[in-house]
Amino acid sequence: MFRKKYSPWIVVAVILVILAAFLWSRTAQTATVDIPAAMGESEVEFGEFAEEYANFPAGYALQVENGTDLTTDGVVFLEKANDDLYVQFTNRSQTDSEFVLKLFLDYSEVDFFIEGVSYSEYEFQLDDGVGVQIPIHLDSQIDLQTSHMLTVGVFAAPNKYASDLDLMSNSYGMVATFEIVSPSGTRTCDTQLQFEEPAKFLKSQFGGVMLNEDFSEEDTDQVLYPLKEVTLSPGEKKSFAYRLGNYSGEVLLIVLVDWKQIPLNGADYLAIENKPGYMGFGQVEITAPMEKGKYEVVAFAVDAPFTPRTADNFFSHDTAYRFTLSVE
């Protein structure tokens, strides 16, 4: 797995065969409304893929704008935290798909408004070659005289399950963190978060994040995929092993079940102090929902989470191979 660094638009290439298995849909609708050239529109707008990105590799493009200024290296200037923002996302995966938008403020899941309606997650359908501009604002009164981090996740095929597919993938959308701060503010994050070393450091060249049931503590470059389906009883607790490979320092692990952030060891995320050349290894506990059914499990890792965004650290986050939690 290779790290992806693209700016000001972040673009991620995908493995098309795997992606097609996740994203294929019989009910795709064609969006034909052009995205306006100027920002400031109040409605969700769909349009044909922008000509300037026609030569980009197949995949996705993600950006956040404030309506007046070009976002450079992931820094978005706002006067107030609830000012309008515009999430721009383009599908060039060569497959039509549904997507779900999730937002996290300082790495905790938050609700947001679109056209005056509150959402914890926003689903939309996008044909290949089509982009969408989604006007959002946060329901937040945080002080932007210092920087805060807005993580934007757009995940593909939210209504499909890994358990029903022949292939597994860790390329199912994009997640990136943008720094929001007042133009007159100080670009520094005021955080008292304590990062801890993982349970063990393993010698490994593996790069990225993995969540599975392999609890072996051997030094190895080979990391096992998770099972496509894990079966639990309602409310049952189960431990999973995490692996965070070749991050150079502070890293957060965030896990979603059914597209909702879940607590990890009593917090919204796991804060790990990793070291280069090693794979951080430990365990987290997941509690099965009380209602029977299928729930998709996804995870992502945020490198240098509270470091101001620059060209050196503004890139899409690594995502783990998704799997299905079946509650019976």
Question: Where are these predicted regions, by residue range?
Answer:
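A eukaryote-biased signal for short, well-structured alpha-helical docking elements
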Residues: 18-63, 173-212
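Short edge beta-strand/loop segments characteristic of extracellular beta-sandwich folds
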Residues: 84-92, 239-245
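Intrinsically disordered, low-complexity Pro/Gly/Ser/Thr-rich segments with frequent PxxP/GP/PP motifs
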Residues: 115-143, 267-284
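Short glycine/proline/serine/threonine-rich loop/turn segments at secondary-structure transition edges
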Residues: 141-151, 290-298
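Short beta-strand elements
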Residues: 161-207, 305-328
